[in-house]
Amino acid sequence: MMNLIPKTNFDFLKIRKYFYAVSAIILIAGLICILTRGLNMGIDFKGGTMVQVQFTESITIDQVRSAVEKYNPEIQSYVGKNTYMIKIKGSQENVNEVRSDVETSLTAAKLKFTVVATDFVGPTVGKDLGERALWALALSLVFMVLYIAFRFQNIIWGTAGVIALIHDAFFMVAAFAFLQKEFDLVIVAALLTAVGYSINDNIVIFDRMRENIKENPKESFYNIVNRSLNETLSRTVITGSTVLIVLVIIYFFGGEVLKNFSLIMLIGVIVGTYSTLFIATPIVYDWAKDSDNFAKTVGNQDVALAAEIKTAKKHNKKKHR
């Protein structure tokens, strides 16, 4: 297969500490943004009124949104029923007022409809959904660590990958806090999807590193890591670019419903590609070069040597006590 990107020989590890610093600065800024601005929680988490409306004529979701857009609603369609659920944030005391406002707006837009039901989703339900979302994210990270550790026979690979995933997830959440985009269950789904994309990128590079270690056991681990990153760079960039093109198209032409989903996916793919090259793999190198267990697993010359030096230092310390 022809590489669209010429063969490269970048020294990724030489500049890794600069990118550690860049990530640290961005993450601190993101934390400050989350603490000061907070997340713009959607009705799924904050609570609000849900008005189910059935129209007598065929109507698109954009027409419904246009009629009630001043209330900043979330709108869900029911396939084949010409029925829509209009969700608007607010307290329980405002349920009747919200229903009346929706009816007035739809009537003003000259739409023929019937209000089927009106319900209120309280903050307790929103809290429960939030806890479930956190559990989903936490469990996905745990299983990813276990899977990578099992596949590569060492916990270092899995832990490095998950550190990068936490980095990516935090960056995406911080970006939404900064932009004050609505954070709901759709965004949680997009978050998990982006995390899955990122770990796949990491596994591709980790697998190449493992193969290069087996084929060249006497080669410096430093060189193996750099070579593996360069050998997979074309695949990483082309795959990321292809996904980005699709997401940009969805963002601009997919309608209002998919706008926030595609936006957080865009952020996730960009940050995920960055963390794969400059965070996850360098962490494996920095951690592995001082690990006895890793040296036994991969049998690489300079990793094993680092482990022997580390053991010798421990022995000398005990001897001089």
UniProtKB/Swiss-Prot annotation:
This is Protein translocase subunit SecF. It is a multi-pass membrane protein. HAMAP family: SecF_B. It comes from the Bacteria. Part of the Sec protein translocase complex. Interacts with the SecYEG preprotein conducting channel. SecDF uses the proton motive force (PMF) to complete protein translocation after the ATP-dependent function of SecA. The keyword Nucleotidyltransferase does not apply. GO terms for molecular function: protein-transporting ATPase activity. Belongs to the SecD/SecF family. SecF subfamily. One of its GO terms (biological process) is protein targeting. Forms a complex with SecD. Part of the essential Sec protein translocation apparatus which comprises SecA, SecYEG and auxiliary proteins SecDF. Other proteins may also be involved. GO terms for cellular component: plasma membrane. The keyword Membrane applies. Gene3D superfamilies: Multidrug efflux transporter AcrB transmembrane domain. It is found in: Cell inner membrane. InterPro entries: SecD/SecF_arch_bac, SecD/SecF_bac, SecD/SecF_CS, SecD_SecF_C, SecD_SecF_C_bact, SecF_bac. The chain crosses the membrane at residues 19-39, 133-153, 159-179, 186-206, 237-257, 264-284. Keywords: Cell inner membrane, Cell membrane, Membrane, Protein transport, Translocation, Transmembrane, Transmembrane helix, Transport.
